[in-house]
From Swiss-Prot:
The modification Phosphoserine is found at S686, S905, S1018. Residues 137-152, 397-421, 1073-1107 have a biased composition (Polar residues). GO terms for biological process: eisosome assembly; plasma membrane organization. One of its GO terms (cellular component) is cytosol. This is Uncharacterized protein C63.14. Keywords: Cytoplasm, Phosphoprotein. It is found in: Cytoplasm. Residues 115-152, 397-426, 705-870, 890-1017, 1029-1107, 1135-1154 are annotated as: Disordered. Residues 941-950, 1138-1150 have a biased composition (Low complexity). Residues 705-767, 783-792, 849-863, 891-902, 920-932, 999-1011, 1032-1045 have a biased composition (Basic and acidic residues). Its main location: cytoplasm. It comes from Schizosaccharomyces pombe (strain 972 / ATCC 24843).
Length: 1184
């Protein structure tokens, strides 16, 4: 324990569990804080071997087989053996004997009975026995006395007999006082005081030991260092001191190894065989004497009993402890001097050497065994230089378990009131491994007394036989060469249950598995690979060689006489000499002792019992053990006399050097203990090495998993992108389909509207022509806006025969509900050929095909019998105009059809055309009426022109108030004479010639099929296919009503349309005009700015001027018309019919442009936008 200044730090339960626990009492006053350590003021300073003597009893003895077998069932696999605690408790109860009743705090007290010879010889006692007894006495002086319930009443009560004379046979010191016990005290107190005085007297004369015969080089500081190492590294000194404590000399490690194992690691020839038996005998006897006293003062509490009153018990403990401590003189001046010196050094070197001095004085005596079972945990705290007294090592945390089998040692703690002497908390600084601290004076003495009873007058053979048997079991129990953790486990468990598979590999596999489990990897694969790495790992310990001492550091030469220096002693070695014998052991006994009851021969590095295969090894071990303590103590005393004048004190220099070396050794050992992992077979591995092994196996796996994960992510991204693109394409297709559907619906709607409007216009035109025929010319309406001309798609495929029949039947039965045909033709003006859209109404759609054919035949016959002297070119021109009137523009755009019709058209007389037109205009007239009409027309024609002339009228557009009529008269000789007449009308419109069809017999089959109303190629069938859906009639009517209301609100006059035709019938005769049309002007301009008839675009102003119903702002902006026609829209439509036109159409060749062949793609047909406020069809809303 640490003693700094004038106060003492009380050890905690973590430092002194079990028999040595200081928590069993709590002094009520600060006066009790002056209780010094268990062994007084540093007993190792006054004589170090006295401290060691009480510690090493267990190492020289063995437990009885019956006790091992009895408690083998209580074995723990990886923890401290509960059997160990039970065994110590049993030894304490057995060693204690009843005594007379005490008057303090117990009803029945005990004293110690120890049987020995009535006249003990001086040779029996070891010089260290007194100091050992004093140490044991001080350890138990502050503990309560045992309860009478744990002591058998059959024991006789006798006082403990301490020798009162000189303890050395050859000592020059006078004999001590023969006074029995101090007077004036109670019997127990007198006995305590007498034992203490005797122990101090024996220790004071220990330096007068006779001169030794064996020389050694182990000085006193080295022996102190060995004692210190034993206290803190009990079973690790030989294994780890050489490797992790470089500043401690090899002699210190060797001495520590001897103290730890009880077997000097030296060749047997170094020691003198004469001292073997005597030294061992004295040592064992005196250890038993000291242990008997310690066991008598032990207190065992059964768990089944009712717990005592802790308050009253504590008060009794405090009062009794204070009274006894005040009466005992156990504190020396040397201890106070050392405490003061250590305190000064710590304060002076707090920053620089705090780590070196930390924990030295405090932990010198912290070597008590731990009867409480602890559970190992991983380190939780680390070393800190600023707080050297509280955080010196990387600590191991232990968790106390419950009591085992009902027997525990009750402990109580005392808290210090001084701040600088505060004991660190349990979890922060256990300065040693409690799991390994099992070689203390109390438990060692108990086991020694339990297992060894010296005979009254033993013989050499008996002693050697018993000693050899004990040493053999001890060495076998060490399981060398193993690391400290396995050694400590072996010491705390019966040998029958030691299984290296659970002891050695359990911890390494558990830690490795837990670490790898945190990585979330494949544990099965990783564990197998890790096990392979561990098996092939080269252990840290070198190959063991026979009879070798501890290996010194490589940078420090060995001062010992050992030729080889491994770190551990191995019982597998082969004896160098073959003449050793097992003294006093029969082969049967040897076989019994060497039999192993656990099955691990195939799993350990050595497979046979070393004492069975090499009998000489047992003798060497026994002899070296007997020589160990006595020879070491003699050498120390001899060298100490020459080194110091006062042998009771140690130089301050030696103490400082020892503190520095041991502090560093403790830190290194604690760090190694915290980090070293035992992998079995005497091998340890650091966490860094284990991590490297694990990473070597894990990294390829992790890399592969990462690569696979990256590939999988890329694949998912690609799949996602493909899915997105597919969805986008699908959406685009859906939108396109929707747009196409909307476009077709809009086109269909426009076609319906155009068809209905055309029908309405035809009806109104028919009424207007009738009015003109009856009453004369009427001013046409004035339109400010235009409608978009009709556009016909390409000719559809021929319908099947069923569809043809259906179309024929439909044309016969539909009557006036049919749509009229619409065509485009050129109206010839002054300077331009303006493409106008004309609606020709065939009013006889309701007739049957048979009636129609009859009418056509009649017209054809009339044409044959009429005027036959008409020029063929004139007839061709007349036929062309007839075709333009009947066949839609789509048919005329077909060059093959147009050329066929034009080329094969015969000449016929204009009278036939007039008669045919008249017949067509009156489909329901009787034969008499038609004949009368024809005769009237013929007569008028004869009167107006001679027979040798044929008159052809061309109506040109004039000014806003005039219609210019140009008449071309062709003589018999072919000369043409043109006359122009101007007729003033209100609002003229362009008119084109309308003549009847040529005779059918002169047409080819294609033309006949086109002209036949029943043919699918006829305009009637074409209109039927184009305008099947007539459901928008109400919508058109509603639209026309709205447009009419707008125009009426604007104050415009609604005038019926008018038309000028070639009818030469009598004025007043009620006949329909030959041509019923309604024109919609659309400008046709060549792409280079020239108009259709070859004149410059400047003439277009005249055209616009003669178009009263055309809004100037709606004229397309093409060519050089930009200034005059601002804001118009231009669009390119289908190819324009390139029918040749000119001022005179009789010969089919234009006189203005006779040599120019025109192409339809050179012209742009501009559909004039509807920008006027005047609606379409507003003039006809009354008729709807």
């Amino acid at each position: 324990m640490s003693t700094l200044g004038n106060s003492t730090v009380k050890p905690t339960n973590a430092e002194f569990p079990g028999l040595h626990a200081m928590e069993r009492y709590k002094p009520a006053t600060s006066e009790s804080l002056y209780v010094k350590g268990h062994y007084g003021p540093h007993p190792h300073k006054e004589h170090p071997a006295a401290y060691v003597a009480a510690k090493t009893g267990f190492n020289a003895t063995s437990r009885r087989q019956s006790v091992r077998e009895h408690h083998s069932s209580h074995e723990g696999s990886a923890q401290l053996n509960p059997d160990r605690i039970l065994y110590m408790s049993a030894g304490a109860v057995t060693a204690a004997v009843p005594n007379k009743e005490h008057t303090d705090n117990v009803t029945t007290s005990q004293t110690i009975r120890y049987e020995t010879s009535s006249q003990p010889s001086q040779e029996v006692y070891h010089p260290h026995a007194g100091k050992a007894a004093q140490s044991a006495h001080v350890m138990n002086s502050t503990e309560s006395r045992p309860s009478s319930a744990h002591v058998s009443s059959s024991y006789t009560q006798k006082p403990f007999a301490f020798p009162l004379g000189p303890v050395f046979a050859t000592s020059s010191q006078a004999a001590a006082s023969e006074t029995a016990l101090p007077s004036g005290y109670e019997p127990d107190e007198a006995r305590f005081i007498g034992a203490s005085q005797l122990a101090k007297l024996s220790a004071s004369h220990a330096h007068q030991t006779p001169a030794q015969t064996v020389d050694d080089d182990v000085p006193l500081p080295t022996r102190m260092a060995a004692t210190e190492l034993v206290g803190h590294i009990p079973l690790r000194a030989a294994n780890y001191a050489n490797e992790y404590s470089q500043d401690v000399p090899a002699s210190t490690h060797r001495a520590a190894s001897e103290l730890v194992h009880g077997v000097p690691m030296r060749a047997s020839g170094i020691n003198d065989p004469k001292h073997d038996l005597d030294a061992a005998t004295r040592h064992n006897i005196n250890s038993v004497a000291a242990a008997s006293y310690v066991a008598a003062r032990s207190r065992v509490i059964e768990e089944e009993e009712e717990p005592p009153n802790e308050v009253k018990e504590r008060m009794d403990y405090e009062a009794d402890a204070q009274r006894r401590i005040r009466k005992m003189n156990v504190f020396g001046s040397a201890g106070a001097a050392l405490r003061e010196r250590t305190q000064q050094d710590l304060m002076a070197n707090e920053q620089e050497h705090s780590g070196e001095f930390a924990g030295f004085s405090r932990n010198l005596t912290n070597t008590a065994a731990a009867p409480t079972t602890y559970e190992y945990k991983r380190p939780t705290s680390s070393y800190t230089a600023k707080d050297a007294t509280s955080k010196v090592y990387r600590s191991n945390t232990y968790k106390p378990k419950s009591s085992v089998n009902g027997s525990v040692y009750r402990s109580k703690s005392v808290k210090s009131t001084t701040s600088h002497n505060k004991v660190p908390e349990r979890n922060s600084v256990p300065a040693y491994n409690e799991k390994l601290m099992h070689s203390s004076a109390a438990n060692a003495a108990i086991l020694s007394h339990k297992n060894y009873s010296p005979p009254v007058q033993p013989t050499r053979d008996d002693e050697v036989s018993q000693e050899d048997a004990r040493v053999k079991e001890i060495v076998r129990g060490m399981k060398l060469p193993l690391t400290s953790s396995s050694l400590s486990a072996a010491a705390y468990r019966p040998m029958e249950k030691q299984d290296p598979a659970t002891v050695e590999r359990h911890h390494i596999q558990a830690e490795a598995t837990q670490r790898v489990r945190d990585m979330k990897l494949d544990l099965t694969k990783l564990e197998s690979k890790t096990n392979d790495e561990i098996r092939s790992y080269r252990p840290r310990n070198v190959v063991i060689k026979p009879y070798a001492a501890a290996t010194p550091p490589k940078n420090i030469p060995s001062t010992y006489r050992a030729p080889q220096a491994p770190s551990v002693l191995s019982p597998v070695v082969t004896a160098s000499e073959g003449d050793f014998e097992l003294d006093g052991i029969t082969p049967e006994r040897q076989q019994t002792m060497t039999r192993s009851t656990y099955q691990e021969s195939s799993q350990r590095p050595f497979h046979e019992d070393p004492f069975r295969t090499h009998p000489g090894l047992l003798q060497a071990v026994a002899r070296n053990h007997r020589n160990s303590l006595a020879n070491i103590d003699e050498r120390i005393m001899r060298q100490n006399q020459a080194a110091t004048a006062n042998t009771n004190t140690v130089s301050e220099t030696d103490i400082e050097a020892l503190e520095r070396r041991l502090s560093k050794a403790y830190r290194m050992e604690a760090q190694e203990e915290a980090y070293a992992i035992n992998i079995g077979g005497g091998r340890v591995i650091s966490p860094e090495e284990l991590e490297e092994i694990a990473r070597r196996n894990v990294d390829p796996m992790v890399s592969e998993l990462s690569e696979r994960a990256a590939q999988e992510r890329e694949r998912k991204e690609q799949a996602k992108e493909a899915k997105r693109l597919k969805k986008l394409a699908k959406e685009e297709k859906r939108l396109k389909k929707k747009e196409e559907k909307a476009r077709k619906a809009e086109e269909k709607r426009l076609q319906k509207e155009r068809a209905k409007y055309a029908k309405q216009m035809s009806r109104e035109s028919a009424h207007a022509d009738q009015a003109i025929a009856n009453t004369g010319p009427v001013a046409p309406p004035y339109f400010e806006h235009e409608t978009e001309p009709s556009h016909y798609e390409e000719e559809e495929e021929e319908e099947p025969e069923e569809r043809r029949e259906e179309s024929s039947h439909f044309s016969e039965s539909s009557g006036n509900n049919e749509f009229e045909e619409t065509e485009q033709e050129y109206t010839h003006g002054y300077g331009n050929d303006v493409l106008v859209q004309r609606t020709d109404v065939v009013n006889n759609f309701g007739e049957s095909s048979h009636a129609h054919d009859n009418a056509v035949n009649e017209k054809r016959d009339l044409g044959r019998n009429g005027f036959g002297d008409v020029d063929e070119q004139d007839a061709t021109e007349v036929y062309r105009h007839s075709i333009e009137r009947i066949v839609p523009g789509d048919y005329l755009h077909d060059e093959k059809t147009r050329d066929t019709l034009t080329r094969e058209s015969p000449a016929f007389r204009s009278e036939e055309a007039v008669v045919e037109v008249a017949d067509e205009d009156h489909p329901h007239a009787s034969e008499a009426e038609r004949a009368h009409s024809y005769s009237n027309r013929k007569q008028a024609s004869s009167e107006s022109s001679p027979e040798s002339q044929s008159t052809h009228y061309n109506d040109y557009e004039g000014t806003e108030d005039n219609i210019v009529r140009q008449t071309t008269t062709v003589d018999e000789d072919g000369h043409q004479e043109q006359t122009t007449s101007t007729t003033k009308v209100a609002h003229p419109i362009p008119v084109s010639n309308g003549l009847s069809s040529p005779p059918r017999e002169r047409l080819d089959d294609n033309a006949k099929e086109i002209l036949s109303r029943s043919s699918p190629k006829s305009p009637v069938a074409w209109f039927k296919r184009k305008f099947k859906n007539r459901k928008d009639k109400a919508a058109v009517k509603r639209m026309l009503e709205e447009d009419s209301s707008k125009q009426l609100s604007s104050g415009r006059d609604v005038v019926a349309p008018t038309s000028v035709n070639h009818d030469v019938s009598h004025v007043g005769e009620s006949t329909k005009p030959a041509v019923n049309n309604s024109t919609k002007p659309v400008a046709v301009t060549s792409k280079n700015g020239h108009s259709r008839n070859g004149s410059h675009a400047a003439h277009s102003n005249n055209v616009i001027g003669t178009q009263p119903h055309v809004n100037v702002s709606a004229v397309p902006n093409t060519g050089n018309l930009k200034d005059a026609l601002e804001g118009s829209a231009v669009s390119k439509t289908d190819d324009v019919d390139n029918v040749v036109s000119g001022h005179s159409n009789v010969n089919g060749v234009s006189k203005s442009r006779p040599n120019i062949v025109e192409r339809s793609e050179d012209y742009v047909i501009s559909h004039l936008p509807e920008q006027s406020r005047a609606p379409i069809g507003a003039a006809f809303q009354e008729d709807l």
